[in-house]
């Protein structure tokens, strides 16, 4: 202490608000079995994001396949992260086949695309997106992270086929 003040002052809320936000360049792709718990999806997402040194605010969107539009665990994850949730058609995810690290016959039979988590993350990031964390899985869910070359916003997602 010098002059009665601690050497390391806590960052005030005002100073936190003045810090620039990190660019929203990460797309978090999620696939899951019907009815997968929000707890399981969140735990998998947290572990996957930790692999890329996740910082609050860097997730631009939680993305998946249209078949999962009403999946409570995916919707809860997006709300928890403060990120929008967007969905792609199976046809749009099928277009990402060549960029997938793994193709699943079981997923293809169920959805019409070869991979949901990786495909959705890559689709959200556009043709110059990079897969940072390939598909990770828990018992009933999958998760992947891709990075776009520029911030991802609603306009970019709509152009890339998200709904």
Q: Where do the PLM segments sit?
A:
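SAM-dependent methyltransferases
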Residues: 1-163
């Amino acid at each position: 202490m010098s002059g009665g003040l601690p050497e390391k002052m806590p960052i005030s809320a005002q100073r936190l608000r003045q810090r620039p936000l990190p660019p929203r360049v990460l797309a978090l792709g999620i696939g899951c079995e019907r009815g997968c718990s929000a707890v399981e999806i969140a735990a998998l997402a947290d572990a996957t994001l930790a692999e890329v040194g996740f910082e609050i605010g860097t997730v631009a969107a939680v993305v998946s396949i249209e078949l999962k539009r009403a999946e409570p665990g995916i919707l809860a994850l997006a709300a928890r992260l403060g990120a929008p949730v967007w969905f792609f058609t199976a046809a749009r995810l099928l277009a990402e086949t060549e960029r997938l690290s793994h193709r699943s016959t079981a997923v293809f039979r169920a959805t019409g695309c070869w991979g949901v988590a990786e495909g959705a993350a890559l689709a959200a990031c556009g043709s110059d997106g990079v897969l940072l964390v390939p598909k990770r899985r828990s018992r009933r869910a999958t998760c992947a992270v891709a990075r776009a070359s520029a911030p991802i916003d609603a306009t970019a997602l709509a152009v890339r086929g998200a709904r």
